[in-house]
């Protein structure tokens, strides 16, 4: 999906609007978002599951705090989604 930052004034708001559209179009689905930058903060905060990837380039501190789960690289995020037991272990009470 193309992020139209000119339409919304910023990429951060554009990503949030895309998320809102996805939720509206898919009311019975859970929306998962993965990101690490300042422009991902609102996206991760408002997704049903927000995963922040720190990676070699690091991550925006507010984005880390806005996410549900923090991982060290994208492969770890994908492994969580592919392995139900890992996701359960991470999110258990």
Swiss-Prot record:
InterPro entries: HAD-like_sf, HAD_sf
SUPFAM superfamilies assigned to the protein according to its UniProt record, in alphabetical order: HAD-like
Name of this protein: Uncharacterized protein MJ0073
Species of provenance: Methanocaldococcus jannaschii (strain ATCC 43067 / DSM 2661 / JAL-1 / JCM 10045 / NBRC 100440)
Species lineage: Archaea, Methanobacteriati, Methanobacteriota, Methanomada group, Methanococci
